[in-house]
Amino acid sequence: NGIAINEADGTAMIGPGCLAGELNEALAKRRLFFPVAHAYTVGMGGFLLQGGFGWNSRTNGLACQNVIGIDVVLADGTLVHANERENKELLWAARGAGPGFFGVVVRFHLKLHPRPKFVGLKLQVFRIRHLEDVLAWADKVGPDVSPAVEFQMVFNRKALGIFSHGLEVMAPVLTDSWRAARDAVAFINESPLRSKASLTLPLMPI
């Protein structure tokens, strides 16, 4: 579960037992970023081999696309390094092979990114009776939503209070300023359905 960060060249080496939250905390201290899993306790080994749709993946790519090398033990017990220059077929296979990968990865080499300076959330909640309208709207605007936004819709049986089911429209946003984040989530405020929302919260830093 080790973490070694090279700030000079923007890379990191991690063990497969490293947790997403542990890596994120270590990178935050250095203002660096990696598209880690959304939950703190997700193990990075399985997450990376499965592809890894993590934070800010629409901007930085899937987590597996940011794996630049692996150290892997093969079936015959040989330890080899794989990157774009050597044993590149192993690196290719590791990017999404999941539990079917034919080796044991003991170390991942990762490409890092500058850390977004602002992370925020825009939230709107609708009653279930508006489901079809909200889905139709989301289908229409979705392709044009900024890559900085993770456009999500979540059914929550407590969205509008105890035993009151609702549909949460959430827009986590990662940018370099509050102004840029505000502009990126403006499509929610401009929605023709905004008057039907039971709750609309302003853009909040998280």
Where are these regions (language model features)?
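FAD-binding core of FAD-dependent oxidoreductases
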Residues: 1-122, 126-129
